């Protein structure tokens, strides 16, 4: 569980921002969103495979030389 200690005379907004940052770093929100609904193992594999293919093509596209613009 993520906890933060309030510093003396620390505004609530600053503490809330610090809390959100720690939650984001731990990846808790993404994990909670993933577990919100049950996902079949086949659907999970299919989603992960599609993400891997997308990353692969994105990496290839970034390594290609740009087309000549004339």
UniProtKB/Swiss-Prot annotation:
Q: Mind listing the GO biological process terms from this record?
A: translation
Give the Gene Ontology MF terms in alphabetical order: structural constituent of ribosome
Keywords in UniProt for this one?
Ribonucleoprotein, Ribosomal protein
The highest taxon in the source lineage is: Bacteria
Q: Name one GO cellular component term.
A: ribosome
* Keyword Ribonucleoprotein included in the entry's annotation: yes
One Pfam family name is Ribosomal_S21
Q: Which family does it belong to?
A: Belongs to the bacterial ribosomal protein bS21 family.
**Annotated protein name in UniProt:** Small ribosomal subunit protein bS21
Which lineage?
Answer: Bacteria, Pseudomonadati, Pseudomonadota, Betaproteobacteria, Burkholderiales
Q: What is the gene called? A: rpsU
């Amino acid at each position: 569980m993520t906890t933060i200690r309030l510093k003396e005379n620390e505004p609530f907004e600053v503490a809330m921002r610090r809390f959100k940052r720690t939650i984001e770093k731990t990846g808790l929100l993404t994990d909670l969103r993933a577990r919100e609904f049950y996902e079949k193992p086949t659907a999970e594999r299919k989603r992960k495979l599609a993400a891997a293919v997308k990353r692969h093509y994105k990496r290839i596209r970034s390594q290609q030389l740009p087309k000549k613009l004339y």
